[in-house]
Swiss-Prot record:
Primary location group: nucleus
UniProt-listed PANTHER family: T-BOX PROTEIN 30_42-RELATED, T-BOX PROTEIN-RELATED
GO CC annotations, alphabetized: chromatin; nucleus
Alphabetical list of InterPro entries matching this protein: p53-like_TF_DNA-bd_sf (IPR008967), T-box_DNA-bd (IPR046360), T-box_sf (IPR036960), TF_T-box (IPR001699), TF_T-box_CS (IPR018186)
Any one GO biological process: positive regulation of DNA-templated transcription
Alphabetized GO MF terms: DNA-binding transcription factor activity, RNA polymerase II-specific; RNA polymerase II cis-regulatory region sequence-specific DNA binding
Subcellular location(s) of the protein: Nucleus
Region (Disordered): 188-215
Biological source species: Caenorhabditis elegans
Nucleus listed as a keyword: yes
Protein name in UniProt: Putative T-box protein 40
């Protein structure tokens, strides 16, 4: 427990820090900022309950000594000396911002997003602290009472959490110990001779990253399939990308699935398929609509609701979010005899943007479940 007159602070994971105290090591390298493990989590007591506070964290040098690792031990280096330039102290404000003292004392204050690096090119982020290898560092917690602006800042050096930044673990036991608790812990260790090795108990995981050539080939394959799509209709500039683009995509039986769920196979620039877009009678035997001709149009362009399949009648209610009303279509109304029909705004005839972005053709399906495009017939 670290104490001061105003309040008390304790590391939430103090037991883990003590297992390697005072020689904890943290990996840093040129691959990017690295997390600190065990994490920097704190419990605070002794605050004024109704005052508001901000909590800040900094990573500061423990001393001005340059260390070395020899004969299995850390100690002051007899060959190299510490840098004389003083390091600028950087503070990281806790993401939660201001909180009441009673709130801070009820919860664990976590700085799990803090990272460290030994390359200044990664210093552009607020949560990244620059550290030098072969030096010892200590986290410092600062608590500021912003309700009473005249009160002084109070800082705590969390000496139980002191650590050495290293590019590889000098103590093999630390790498093994961290791997038990932290899934991202590295197994790299340094032998007495200065060589790197991987822990023999670790298993090599196959890389999931594609090489540049593999990625380019995959992209070309997708573009080739898209350009050769059999369902591409040049006359209406409509088509859809085949499921065969990737063998990992689940394949559905095309005929039965399209007949039951035509919304799952939409075509580009084609209106949503609603019941009101099928004024032609439905052939139950062939499971499709009759070709839309003047003879097959329902009288007065009113649909015979009983001739429509259930999936068409229920589409609007079942898939309202996927297929909202198009702005050029009015809402549906009822004729005196109760059959629904559709209004259309005549402004589409003079609206070039509409004609270029929205086709007035409807999609039906043939015996094989493939879309058939019929021209739009104006109502009588």
């Amino acid at each position: 427990m670290i104490q001061q007159a105003q309040f008390n602070v304790q590391m939430a994971e103090e037991d883990r820090w003590l297992t390697q105290y005072p020689n904890m090591e943290m990996i840093v390298n040129n691959k990017g900022p690295k997390p600190i493990f065990p994490e920097l989590n704190f419990n605070i007591t002794g605050l004024e309950e109704k005052s508001r506070y901000v909590v800040l964290l900094s990573i500061q040098k423990f001393d001005n000594i340059r260390y070395g690792f020899k004969n299995g031990k850390w100690g002051p280096s007899k060959v190299r000396h510490a840098t004389k330039k003083e390091q600028e102290i950087k503070y990281f404000l806790h993401p939660d911002g201001t909180k009441l003292g009673e709130e801070l004392m009820k919860e664990t204050i976590k700085f799990d997003t803090v990272r460290i690096t030994n390359h200044k090119k990664f210093m552009d982020k607020d949560n990244v602290f620059f550290v030098e290898t072969m030096h010892k560092y200590v986290p410092v917690l600062t608590v500021k009472n912003i309700t009473n602006v005249e009160s002084a800042n109070h800082s705590m050096r969390m000496e139980v959490a002191q650590f050495f930044p290293v590019t590889v673990y000098n103590q093999e036991s630390i790498g093994n110990w961290k791997s038990k608790f932290h899934k991202n812990a590295t197994f790299e260790n340094r032998l007495d001779g200065g060589n790197k090795r991987k822990n023999t108990n670790s298993r090599e995981e196959p890389s999931s990253k594609r090489s540049k050539n593999e990625t380019e080939i995959a992209v070309l394959d997708i573009l080739q399939v898209a350009s050769q799509s059999e369902n591409y209709n040049e006359s209406t500039n409509s088509g859809r990308l085949q499921n065969e683009i990737s063998s990992s995509i689940h394949q559905f039986p095309s005929t039965s699935y399209q007949n039951q769920y035509p919304h799952a196979y939409p075509t580009v620039n084609t209106p949503p398929i609603y019941a009101q877009q099928f004024p032609a009678p439905f052939d139950e035997k062939q499971n499709q609509f009759y070709p839309k001709t003047d003879e097959n149009l329902a009288p007065n362009c009113a649909q015979d609701a009983s001739s429509l399949p259930n999936f068409a009648m229920n589409q609007k209610a079942s898939f309202a979010n996927q297929y909202p009303y198009h702005p050029y279509y009015h809402q549906y109304s009822q004729l005196d005899h109760g059959s629904p029909y559709q209004y259309m705004n005549n402004s589409i005839n003079s609206d070039s943007s509409f004609q270029s972005s929205f086709s007035t053709e409807n999609s039906y399906f043939d015996d094989n479940g493939n879309p058939i495009h019929y021209p739009y017939y104006p109502y009588k």
